[in-house]
């Protein structure tokens, strides 16, 4: 791994998080304390209909364990809102989950049917307007979480990987281990 400064783990399904992986992340200095967990939802029924192999409680346990074992870990996730049959109650369960878990980074996609997938023909497709409202609600909540997280970083000294100089400015562009290129902006 000579010449490589940082290794970042992206798109790691929650069920793939083992004690061994946690130890490697914790002990290998080149592996960023950053993990992208595509959880998609937090309601057990929706997770099952999506074909996911974890439950809400397992997700809570994984996030809790990661934060306990690696206190400075940056956790990122992606969610899908408006999956066929998603009720307002199931959506609110997802909102509460996001509020409780306080992910450092979070993206929300609205469900869109893909040809030849089981979900494309499921009953109770959600109206586009409802999907967009749900997405906006989750992103507004995440903005609050992101603001709180950023406030906690004030005064911290962090290693920054410089990516380039800003043209015609006496400044540079860089990122910390908490910022994945092309994912976190």
Outline where the language-model segments fall.
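AMP-binding (ANL) adenylation modules
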Residues: 110-115, 150-151
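Intrinsically disordered, low-complexity segments enriched in small/polar residues
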Residues: 11, 107-109, 170
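Terminal RNA-binding accessory module
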Residues: 121-185
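Residue-identity detector for glycine
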Residues: 3, 51, 82-85, 107, ...
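Glycine-rich phosphate-binding active-site loops on the catalytic face of alpha/beta enzymes
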Residues: 107-112, 178
């Amino acid at each position: 791994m000579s010449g490589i400064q940082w290794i970042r783990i992206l798109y790691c399904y929650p069920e793939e998080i083992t004690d061994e992986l946690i130890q490697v992340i914790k002990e290998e200095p080149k592996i960023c304390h950053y993990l992208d967990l595509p959880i998609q939802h937090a309601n057990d029924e929706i997770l099952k209909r999506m074909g996911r192999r974890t439950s809400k409680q397992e997700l809570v346990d994984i996030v809790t364990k990661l934060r306990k074992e690696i206190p400075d870990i940056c956790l990122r996730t992606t969610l899908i809102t408006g999956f066929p049959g998603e009720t307002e109650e199931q959506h609110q369960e997802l909102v509460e989950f996001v509020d409780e878990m306080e992910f450092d980074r979070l993206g929300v996609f609205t469900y869109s049917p893909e040809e030849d997938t089981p979900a494309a023909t499921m009953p109770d497709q959600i109206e586009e307007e409802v999907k967009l409202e749900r997405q906006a609600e989750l992103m507004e909540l995440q903005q609050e979480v992101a603001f709180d997280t950023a406030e906690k970083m004030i005064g911290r000294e962090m290693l920054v990987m410089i990516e380039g100089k800003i043209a015609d400015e006496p400044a540079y562009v860089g990122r910390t281990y908490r910022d994945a290129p092309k994912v976190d902006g």
